[in-house]
Structure formats: C-alpha cells, structure tokens
Swiss-Prot record:
GO terms for cellular component: nucleus; Shu complex. Keywords: DNA damage, DNA recombination, DNA repair, Metal-binding, Nucleus, Zinc, Zinc-finger. A zinc finger (SWIM-type) spans 76-114. Its main location: nucleus. This is Zinc finger SWIM domain-containing protein 7. The gene is zswim7.
Length: 140
C-alpha cells in the first residue's frame, strides 16, 4: 500500500475522532470515506465496535494490549504499536497480498479508541504475560 493512502487513512481517522467527539455519530460522508479507504472490513469493524467487542487490557507495569472478540467467537490480541493482528485475514490480505491496510480487528481497535468506545480491563502482570505470549492461563 502506498504511503499516500496511509496518510489519507490517518487523516480520515483524525476527522472521525474529532467529528464523533462533537456529535456522537459518524456522518454518511465519513462512512463512505471509511468504506473507500478500508474496503469491506470498515463496516465489519464498525459492527465489532457496536457490539463492544474491543477491550483494552492493561497491567500495573504499564503494558497494554487490545483484545477483539471476532464474529466466530475467537479472541484476537491486536497490537496497534506494531500494526499486527494474528487473524488469518491479516496474514493473507495485509501481509501476503498487500490488498488492505489492516484487518477488521485492527481497524475495530483504532475506531473504538477514536470513538471512546473501547472497554477497559485491568489484569495482573502475570496475566498480561500470558496474554502477550498467547498461552492459555492455568485455572487455579
């Protein structure tokens, strides 16, 4: 993807954040622009935001990760700092085919932050280690 498209996407997300903070909705022109820049995953990402599927998980040490409950019920841990999601769509359409800027999960994280609709969850440092290493936590 070209750097000019990335710049357009960044500006679009800034406009969305400003507009949503003022009127608490996304006007049609911004919805159309989202669809144009991000493709079909834009509406899917907005659906995830509407379903409150995005959670910002943070620990006392200051580590932070975002978890998105996908439509299939699978939980994806996304990282905005390095622009990564472990879902198959990210691997295929973003990394391999370079057809999209991001998957719906990563876009949902960015949109939920811009709209102030991200769920918050505090976890211990040990729990965060398990989340970041993608190891299931042992039940005790």
């Amino acid at each position: 993807m070209g750097s000019s498209l990335v710049s357009v996407a960044e500006q679009l997300l800034k406009d969305l954040q400003r507009t949503y903070s003022e009127i608490k909705q996304i006007p049609d022109d911004l919805l159309i622009a989202l669809r144009f820049v991000f493709g079909p995953c834009a509406l899917q990402a907005l659906d995830l935001v509407d379903q409150h599927s995005v959670t910002c998980v943070s620990s006392p040490s200051g580590r932070k990760a975002f978890q998105v409950l996908g439509g299939s019920g699978r939980l994806y841990t996304c990282f905005t700092s390095c622009h990564y999601c472990p879902c198959p769509a990210f691997s295929f359409t973003v990394l391999r085919r370079n057809e999209s800027l991001m998957c719906k999960h990563l876009l949902a994280v960015i949109l939920s932050q811009a709209m102030g609709l991200c769920q918050q969850e505090q976890v211990s440092d040990q729990q965060m280690t398990h989340i970041l290493s993608r190891q299931p936590e042992a039940s005790t």
